[in-house]
Regions:
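Short, low-complexity N-terminal tether/leader segments at secretion or assembly junctions of large
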Residues: 1-24
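Extracellular jelly-roll beta-sandwich "head" domains, especially the C-terminal globular C1q domain
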Residues: 43, 67-75, 85-148
């Protein structure tokens, strides 16, 4: 059975999306990605959402051929006040994480992506090479907790 939203629930959701902190900055923000340019790669969806203290990233795309390592999947340009709250792991690296690549012929491969911080830009980069003998799809979901 489909849930029908009451007027009160709609107003509550709207108030959450308009939430601001003590400095008047929105705590619900949506940011579109800038896809990287690499032959054999396509980013179909890239979005980042700040929801309170959670900075949530989702990237979906595909590869159509083998690709050497170290290239940009996509970038997110963040407001300066959010970028200042991101703590680096080492050098300019925020994190290095695994994700799955699934080809149309059923082959599953684990690969690594790295998140670099360059000023107020977060760069999601392919850290390892990609073995994509056929159309290979991927989805990255990453949640980063930022301080208040």
């Amino acid at each position: 059975m489909k849930h029908m939203w009451s007027e009160e629930e709609i107003q509550e959701q709207a108030s959450i999306e308009n939430l601001v902190d003590s400095k008047g900055r929105n705590r619900f923000i949506e940011i579109e990605s800038t896809p990287g340019e690499r032959d054999g790669m396509q980013i179909n969806y890239g979005k980042c959402v700040l929801n309170g203290n959670n900075l949530i990233f989702e990237i979906q795309g595909n590869f159509t051929k083998n690709i050497a390592p170290d290239f940009t999947l996509c970038k997110f340009t963040l407001p300066e006040w959010i970028a200042q709250k991101i703590i680096l792991g080492f050098a300019n690296v925020v994190d290095l994480s695994p994700y799955s690549l699934i080809s149309t012929d059923g082959v599953v491969e684990t690969s690594l992506y790295c998140i670099y911080k360059e000023g107020n830009i977060l760069n999601f980069s392919q850290y390892t090479g990609v073995n994509a003998p056929s159309l290979t799809v991927f989805k990255i979901r990453y949640n980063l907790i930022i301080s208040k």
